[in-house]
């Protein structure tokens, strides 16, 4: 079931020539859908405008999970932070939308997170590391990067 959901989400959000990458990150593949708090979806556009951002959000609101046999109502979280909905029969789609430049900044500021994302094989378009890679994790990253060790 999750493989079908992953494939559906990847193709659903890879709907425009301006979108360079769609990657599903997190534990969706390893868990039952009922045990998943949210589905993390990274979307990288070549250049993100206000109109394209709104187009992605509008497109997301039209998603129909019932078409693939999943009877859950999708709830959107287009913020970069966690947002949990405690509604039964729903699943949170956590859309993290970047353009190439903001993705580069995220790699620089949060190399641990981005390194983890790069390891995902659940993507369409360019691999995240093809857009801008985490070259290596440095000792200083353990202290100064977001999600580093304090």
Each language-model region and where it sits:
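Hydrophobic/anchoring residues in structured secondary elements
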Residues: 21-24
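Acidic Asp/Glu-based divalent-cation binding sites
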Residues: 38-40
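Catalytic core of pol beta-like nucleotidyltransferases
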Residues: 1-18, 29-36, 45-150
